[in-house]
């Protein structure tokens, strides 16, 4: 679960107690959003209650499609408390919801789109891969949904499944600017991979941030941190744009890595521990460097 925005205590309370009034809604809601009882005090308990009761007022017996924008809004309100609710309550809530919609392929598709918008897309307030995977799994297993509609989601499921925090980072092939074939594999050294484009302003800023930080550069020079810059899906002439990268970085391009890993941002940073497991993904360069400092603090 990765929160992308910091909410104040006041906004949190408003989002949980008065979810309808917390936002300006220009569409008609599908149903009246529930309000947690006043006697429930803690943020966790309020969130648990909403997981249990959020969809109580929705009519799941209708066979036709619903307004997608309205469903997206409802799902966004539903998903925000997931970051404070107990995992067991979230899992139970999602399982119950999927059970209600699994026999209605139209509604299942719409809910999958809503989950994508609120839990996976770049504009989502939070990313919760484990929950989004549950919707993808149900959607892809539904035999009533045409295969052509599943292709994009099949790719997402493969990328996310390969990239879960705590899992071993998968290997991938790349080519260096000099044409030498390379292969990334976890090597027992703390590693930061920036998947980006030399022409991308944010990517250049991240590169500059790492190479000009004296403390971070020292870790790289001493072999305590391994840094890779990989260009996904390269076009002709990419080699000429990667001539000014630090010599102790591994640089290259890969035309297959975007099919293997979840690279929903540009740049996408992956932080990989000494044990080869993904510690964080799609974080900022500052977050990646902060983890590097923490993980190497005991190394001399």
Predicted regions and their residues:
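Thiol-based oxidoreductase modules, predominantly thioredoxin-like and allied folds used
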Residues: 221-237, 246-256
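Oxidative protein folding and maturation machinery
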Residues: 22-182
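Short, internal strand/loop/helix patches
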Residues: 242-275
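Positively charged n-region of N-terminal signal peptides that target proteins for export
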Residues: 1-5
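Structural alpha/beta surface segment adjacent to cysteine/selenocysteine redox centers
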Residues: 57-81, 188, 235-247, 261-264
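Non-catalytic, surface beta->alpha helical segment in thiol-disulfide oxidoreductase systems
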Residues: 265-300
């Amino acid at each position: 679960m990765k929160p992308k925005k910091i909410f104040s205590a006041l906004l949190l309370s408003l989002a949980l107690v008065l979810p309808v009034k917390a936002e300006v809604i220009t569409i008609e809601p599908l149903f009246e959003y529930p309000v947690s009882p006043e006697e429930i005090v803690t943020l966790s308990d309020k969130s648990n209650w909403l997981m249990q009761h959020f969809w109580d007022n929705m009519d799941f017996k209708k066979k036709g499609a619903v307004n997608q924008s309205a469903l997206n809004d409802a799902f966004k309100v539903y998903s925000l408390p997931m970051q404070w609710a107990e995992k067991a309550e979230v899992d139970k809530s999602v399982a119950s919801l999927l059970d209600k919609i699994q026999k209605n392929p139209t509604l299942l598709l719409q809910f999958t789109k809503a989950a994508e918008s609120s839990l996976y897309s770049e504009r989502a307030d939070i990313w919760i891969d484990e929950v989004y995977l549950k919707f993808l799994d149900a959607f892809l297993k539904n035999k009533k949904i045409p295969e052509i509609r599943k292709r994009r989601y099949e790719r997402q499921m493969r990328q996310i499944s390969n990239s879960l925090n705590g899992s071993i980072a998968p290997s991938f092939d790349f080519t260096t600017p000099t044409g030498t074939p390379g292969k990334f594999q976890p090597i027992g050294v703390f590693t930061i991979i920036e998947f980006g484009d030399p022409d991308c302003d944010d990517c250049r800023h991240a590169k500059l941030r790492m190479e000009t930080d004296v403390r971070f550069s020292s870790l790289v020079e001493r072999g305590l941190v391994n840094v890779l810059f990989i260009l996904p899906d390269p076009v002709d002439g990419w080699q000429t744009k990667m001539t000014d990268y630090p010599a102790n970085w591994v640089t290259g391009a890969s035309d297959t890595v975007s099919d293997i890993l979840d690279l929903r941002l540009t740049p996408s940073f992956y932080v990989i521990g000494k044990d080869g497991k993904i510690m964080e993904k799609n974080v900022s360069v500052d977050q990646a460097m902060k983890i590097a400092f923490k993980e190497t603090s005991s190394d001399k």
